[in-house]
Amino acid sequence: MASTASLRVAPQADTYAAYQTPLAVRQACRSGALTGPTAGMAPGYVQGNLAVLPKELAEEFLRFCHFNPRPCPVIGMSEPGSFKVPVLGEDLDIRTDFPGYRVWQDGEVIADTADVTDYWRDDLVAFVIGCSLSFEEALMAEGLPLRHVDRNVRVPMFRTTVQCVPAGRFSGRMVMSMRPLVPAHAIRAIQITTRFPQVHGAPLHVGLPELIGVKDLMKPDYGDAVEVLDNELPVFWACGVTPQSVIAEAKPSFAITHAPGCMLVTDRRNTEFAIL
């Protein structure tokens, strides 16, 4: 799949100050005022990735997520045809409340859009999948710097050679997000993120990116490149963009996903998903 590193323009720093509550973020998406990444917005609240598939594939995809809980932890699911997921928020519309979407046909992206109302069908089932942006607040609270947040860009994401556990028509390579950290911070990040298994949990890989098929850290498959300094390690977490890699392999007749880095900000608090 071609790189999408330039798909979205990063917001200015004052954008983050404007969107401190989940509803404010969703309303900005709904109105078209927000079309960029959501990292750092509405601190303390869970963010989610999106995969929307026809009802005939929903059970199969749910089984795939069950087999692959690290990259695909389902935190909410709609009824067929419904664009509401009440467990994640009452004033919430799956069709409009992400800053950006991708529309897929037969495994190919046919549209990038800020609103999928015109594409919605009565047979569609929406899956909201936990996102690592949710645990970033906990990392920053411990003083761990996150370069993509500091620079107002999307976290870099890579299609690795790590294979997901297949389920029916769904199989493929796992996508991982990467954050550069000095060794002491990497150790602390492992300790912190272990508490959040429903938003990907602890890292799956640290250092030596070539062992998971990442040849160039400055050329992410999704998101934006950030440099890794000589005293830092690349730390990789399972990523909720994995369904997009899998959809490209499975080639369903129709699907909708979020644009990488452009998440749903829910009304659920990060602390609700912590286990320790």
From Swiss-Prot:
UniProt source species: Xanthobacter autotrophicus (strain ATCC BAA-1158 / Py2)
Protein name: Putative hydro-lyase Xaut_1503
Record family assignment: Belongs to the D-glutamate cyclase family.
GO molecular function, one term: lyase activity
UniProt keyword annotations, A-Z: Lyase
NCBIfam families given in the database record: PRK05463.1
EC number: 4.2.1.-
Record-linked InterPro entries: D-Glu_cyclase, Putative_hydro-lyase, UPF0317
